[in-house]
Amino acid sequence: MQALVLLLWTGALLGHGSSQNVPSSSEGSPVPDSTGEPVEEEDPFFKVPVNKLAAAVSNFGYDLYRLRSSASPTGNVLLSPLSVATALSALSLGAEHRTESVIHRALYYDLITNPDIHSTYKELLASVTAPEKNLKSASRIVFERKLRVKSSFVAPLEKSYGTRPRILTGNPRVDLQEINNWVQAQMKGKIARSTREMPSALSILLLGVAYFKGQWVTKFDSRKTTLQDFHLDEDRTVRVPMMSDPKAILRYGLDSDLNCKIAQLPLTGSMSIIFFLPLTVTQNLTMIEESLTSEFIHDIDRELKTIQAVLTVPKLKLSFEGELTKSLQDMKLQSLFESPDFSKITGKPVKLTQVEHRAAFEWNEEGAGSSPSPGLQPVRLTFPLDYHLNQPFLFVLRDTDTGALLFIGRILDPSST
């Protein structure tokens, strides 16, 4: 993992010398093993089973995001990878060893020594979809018409993932309507009905849907929201509604390796959004994207410093509807679409045909209060600091309790949502 280098302009802090920000040579040093080679000790956070599982499926999510980003280099990108990972993890319940191993490697389960991943996944889902989180996330497995599904697959699926598979009727219009009705019910009407046609020769369809509307811990004053320039690149701008807070309390750092400014804003329900803003106006965020892992984001969360800044954030409302089939095939899951062994599901040969994802995400001025939490004490700076999200940026919505990646987005043009 790339080492995190976060600087808060050493020497610009009042009463906070650089020696307080840099660990001593002995502090945190790896302990040598029996061969004398240093062995990095696992962070205690990841020793908690649900957190370790969250890190694994989040790393799957970052992999999936990178593939989607490279496939759409000039547009906004929005994903809720957890809903897709959940569908895959649930499908693995019906896979024999060879096929199960393929899925588990993609989800990074091969790095987890957990005898009961699926019960831990149930705990993860209960945590991230608790009512106070404001996250709606659901996954479903849809099977071809008249398929006989074994009860030995349905029972653990319902127990760990809270869902039952759907068997198609064979009538494309009726089947699409039923799936749309299910999405509407799960998302409380927050995601539009799909007009996409059902695939003609469907065997297994995985569907992952998610919706999130953020509630800031400290709300923005809507009277300060104005139309401002958003710089698409060095030559082009668009006018978009920008929320402002001249005395925002946020967590901040500068990553000199990635040439970006990082800020973290808290949301209600023990969640936060981490923003990555390049030092120069560019639509190429590849260097930042390539660095993203669960461990890297966890390090950022530990290292950022609480400061006061002049903050501007565009109002945002994004949605995505589309197939992720090609992306999953590129993640070494091609065999699931060709000759998998799902004999724990049915006696008939079946294979994955399509993976569909629908997601919606928004934030505006709404928040829990008009002032920061009294316990937040910002570091005092000798000069004012600005953090203006008025150019292409990347954001990560993270569950603070488990570290799970819930949404990830790249915003190249907030007016094109």
Curated annotation (Swiss-Prot):
Its main location: secreted. It is found in: Secreted; Melanosome. Glycans are attached at residue 284. GO terms for molecular function: serine-type endopeptidase inhibitor activity. One of its GO terms (cellular component) is extracellular space. The keyword Aminoacyl-tRNA synthetase does not apply. Residues 17-41 are annotated as: Disordered. This is Pigment epithelium-derived factor.
